[in-house]
UniProtKB/Swiss-Prot annotation:
Gene Ontology process terms (BP): adenylate cyclase-activating G protein-coupled receptor signaling pathway; adrenomedullin receptor signaling pathway; amylin receptor 3 signaling pathway; calcium ion transport; cellular response to estradiol stimulus; G protein-coupled receptor signaling pathway; G protein-coupled receptor signaling pathway involved in heart process; intracellular protein transport
Site (Required for CALCRL interaction): D112, S140
Major location (coarse): membrane
Keyword Glycoprotein part of the UniProt annotation: yes
Topology feature Extracellular, residues: 23-112
Protein name: Receptor activity-modifying protein 3
Source organism: Mus musculus (Mouse)
Length: 147
């Protein structure tokens, strides 16, 4: 019987073969969709440790979310699928809706000022720029008269 140290040299070969199997066998979407809810359940169980009013504060559960992300990536790869993919993203979006639907950020809604204010704010600098350029050109043509 081989010791773990003796089997260690087989690890790269095993990883290579597993990677090739995923590419040859293709993506088992059905299997992936059966396995992803395990990640969601584990995440839900971990989120029960966090008070609901803290669910919008990422620093309160970032470790749990990282674990959830790693789980979805691993389960997706085991089934020979790339991560992320549309089905996995749809599942993750569903988890987001379940836990973070009330986490909207109130942002200031900016509006343009009324036209009575906006037009002068645009027109005055344009007119001044044209006037100053014209003054420079006119002055450069008439410099010999001043000297």
């Amino acid at each position: 019987m081989k010791t773990p140290a003796q089997r260690l040299h087989l690890l790269p070969l095993l990883l290579l073969l597993c990677g090739e199997c995923a590419q040859v066998c293709g993506c088992n979407e059905t299997g992936m969709l059966e396995r992803l809810p395990r990640c969601g359940k584990a995440f839900a169980d971990m989120m029960q440790k966090v008070a609901v009013w803290k669910w919008c504060n990422l620093s309160e559960f970032i470790v749990y979310y990282e674990s959830f992300t790693n789980c979805t990536e691993m389960e997706t790869n085991i089934m020979g699928c790339y991560w992320p993919n549309p089905l996995a993203q749809s599942f993750i979006t569903g988890i987001h809706r379940q836990f973070f639907s009330n986490c909207t950020v109130d942002r200031t809604h900016w509006e343009d000022p009324p036209d009575e204010v906006l037009i002068p704010l645009i027109a005055v600098p344009v007119v001044l720029t044209v006037a100053m350029a014209g003054l420079v050109v006119w002055r450069s043509k008439h410099t010999d008269r001043l000297l």
